[in-house]
Amino acid sequence: MLDKSKRYLIVGLGLLGGKYALELSRAGFHVDGINRSEGHLQYALDHGYIASGKTHDFEDLVRQADHIIFGLYPTALLEWFRIYGHLLKEGCIFTDVSGVKTGLVEPIQAMCRPGVEFIASHPMAGRETSSVEHAAEVNFAPANFIVTPTEKNTPEAVQWARELAEVLGFKHICTLTVQEHDRMIGYVSQLCHAIAVSLMCANDNTSLCEYTGDSFRDLTRIARINDKMWAELFLWNKENLISEIDQFSGALNEMRNALVADDREMLEEMFRLSTQRRAAFDKKAP
């Protein structure tokens, strides 16, 4: 069980950072916040997400924190840690919410002084909306929480990350290496967003909105996207994503070839395979 005498600090009160603050405060933990936007910080204060917070001159909050959760984009997290990482006190264990780990975990762990530990993790619970004002809408229970330890992590830090996930309400918690995580995320998350965005960008289809059915709405739901965040995540994981796009393009081209050749048997075979794999997925899904 997490020690409720420990002080938590959320750096970046966006959608996920705000949700972490909300759930930890509800569970009885002392939570402070740091955020660039005064308006979002005030929202978190007014709604009881955090006990105190600052937009600047926040060094005291960093020094006091026993645990820190970074709700920042990877580039911003690296820059923040280069400037303020020396302020973290001995014994501090901290984590992130980033959807990409390669290029982030190793540099930050290398910058940690003795007695300070970074255990990376990823709550797979993002939404089309952003900002702390929508944090209460996020439901962690059905989502996956992934811990990505390295050889530099202690068993105590890994256990802390798992217990944190439990307090936050996650029901499915797993462990992957950094490389496994980024390969997986390139397929199950980033490729899906790439397909949805490409479908919406293929032509100007706004005139068809009154005719669309559930299939179009379901497939393009995630196309309403945070452009800055997803551009960064795509570029940080571009090797894995390009590989997945190439495989997807190959499968789509097979379907195109079957259509050109009037190959009904090939089409039916593809449909059967997709149905079988989806059924297997449904059985394994938490």
Where are these regions (language model features)?
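Short beta->alpha hinge that forms the Motif I/post-I loop of the SAM-binding pocket
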Residues: R36, L72-Y73, V97
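Residues at the starts of beta-strands that form the adenosine-phosphate
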Residues: R7, H30-D32, E117, N144, ...
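Rossmann-like NAD(P)(H) cofactor-binding subdomain of soluble oxidoreductases
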Residues: W80-E133
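Conserved short alpha-helix immediately C-terminal to the canonical SAM/SAH-binding motif I
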Residues: G39-H40, A76, K101-L104
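Interdomain hinge/lid region at the active-site interface
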Residues: S207-R277
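NAD(P)+-binding Rossmann beta1-loop-alpha1 motif at the extreme N-terminus of oxidoreductases
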Residues: M1-R63, H67
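Rossmann-like NAD(P)-binding element
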Residues: F58-L88, C92-I93
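Internal alpha-helical scaffold of NAD(P)-dependent oxidoreductase catalytic cores
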Residues: E137-I222
